[in-house]
Amino acid sequence: MKYVALAFVLSLVILQISAQVGAAYIPGMGSIGSVGRAGAAAGASAGIGNQGRGAGLLRFFTLILENLMKNNQQAQPKQDNFGAQLQNLLKKKMILEMIN
């Protein structure tokens, strides 16, 4: 029982750190930490036995995958926009080099 509690607390700490790092570096990724905490709490409250932990882990990973897919769909236009901006900057640089 104490190992379950220890694993639960450690998972919350790791998820909090990953949420802060994700929010700092990747737009939209900070919400994964909150989703992960909800999944871990659901797993812990579902039961002490293996079934409860298994259901909680399954829900936890399902929520993370759903969130990653949602963030990936939202991020694709940003990546295309970044490529267009990069090409635009390279064109401007080439024009400036020609002038000089």
Swiss-Prot record:
Major location (coarse): secreted
**Protein name in the entry:** Uncharacterized shell protein 7
Q: What is the lineage of its organism?
A: Eukaryota, Metazoa, Spiralia, Lophotrochozoa, Mollusca
Keywords linked to the UniProt accession: Secreted, Signal
* Domain of life of the native organism: Eukaryota
> Which locations, inside or outside the cell, does it occupy?
Secreted
One GO cellular component term of this record is: extracellular region
Q: In which tissues is it expressed?
A: Nacreous layer of shell (at protein level). Expressed primarily in the mantle with highest level in the mantle pallium and lower level in the mantle edge.
Residues making up the signal peptide according to the UniProt record: 1-23
